[in-house]
Curated annotation (Swiss-Prot):
Name of the protein in its database record: T-cell surface glycoprotein CD3 gamma chain
Keywords: Adaptive immunity, Cell membrane, Disulfide bond, Glycoprotein, Immunity, Immunoglobulin domain, Membrane, Phosphoprotein, Receptor, Signal, Transmembrane, Transmembrane helix
Disulfide bridges in this chain: C45-C86
GO cellular component, one term: external side of plasma membrane
Gene3D superfamilies listed in its UniProt record: Immunoglobulins
PTM entry text: Phosphorylated on Tyr residues after T-cell receptor triggering by LCK in association with CD4/CD8. Phosphorylated also by PKC; leading to the TCR complex down-regulation.
Keyword presence, Transmembrane helix: yes
Organism: Macaca fascicularis (Crab-eating macaque)
Motif window: Di-leucine motif: 152-153
PANTHER family in alphabetical order: T-CELL SURFACE GLYCOPROTEIN CD3 GAMMA CHAIN, T-CELL SURFACE GLYCOPROTEIN CD3 GAMMA CHAIN / DELTA CHAIN
Alphabetical GO biological process terms: adaptive immune response; cell surface receptor signaling pathway; establishment or maintenance of cell polarity; positive thymic T cell selection; protein transport; regulation of lymphocyte apoptotic process
């Protein structure tokens, strides 16, 4: 029982130390990204030097004075991507990768996304086929209606005779021959 409490205390101490280590690493960052309300993206360098040099993709962009330690990347709609770094005369920051995905309704097509679409399509076609099979496979037995039982013509009279007409256009069956009564 005593060993179990000691092991639990040891695991708890390790977890707490990892949290404090992560917090101390976060506090030591010298390069931060800020997304402004107007849509612009700012990089802030926290090195204590008079001259700050900005780098993008390893190439120098600009040299600023110490009280101008912010670099405006422009509007986030213009897709400010890249690997940025700031460097003072004595120390330099770690690299920071900035990536904005501006298409809010877009889907990034990778293998997992395409596989998901194909799988969903196959499943939906399967359910549709099962539904059609069960609906079409039912026997045609239906309840008879009153209109099905109603006779429209009496049984003894299959055809209605033509009325006698004198010399009208439709009083003749063939050609110009008159109809005899």
């Amino acid at each position: 029982m005593v060993q179990g409490k000691g092991l639990t205390g040891f695991i708890l101490a390790i977890i707490l130390l990892q949290g404090s280590l992560a917090q101390s690493f976060e506090e030591n960052r010298k390069l931060n990204v800020y997304n402004q309300e107007d849509g612009s993206v700012l990089l802030t360098c926290h090195v204590k030097n008079t001259n700050i040099t900005w780098f993008k993709e390893g190439k120098m962009i600009d040299i600023l004075t110490a009280h101008k330690n912010k670099w405006n990347l422009g509007s986030n709609t213009k897709d400010p991507r890249g690997v940025y770094q700031c460097k003072g005369s004595k120390d330099k920051s770690k690299t920071l990768q900035v990536y904005y995905r501006m298409c809010q309704n877009c889907i990034e097509l990778n293998a997992a996304t395409i596989l998901g679409f194909v799988f969903a399509e196959i499943i939906s076609i399967f359910f549709l086929a099962v539904g059609v099979y069960f609906i079409a496979g039912q026997d045609g037995v239906r309840q008879s209606r009153a209109s099905d039982k109603q006779t429209l013509l009496p049984n003894d009279q299959l055809y209605q005779p033509l009325k006698d007409r004198e010399d009208d256009q439709y009083s003749h069956l063939q050609g110009n021959q008159l109809r005899m009564n």
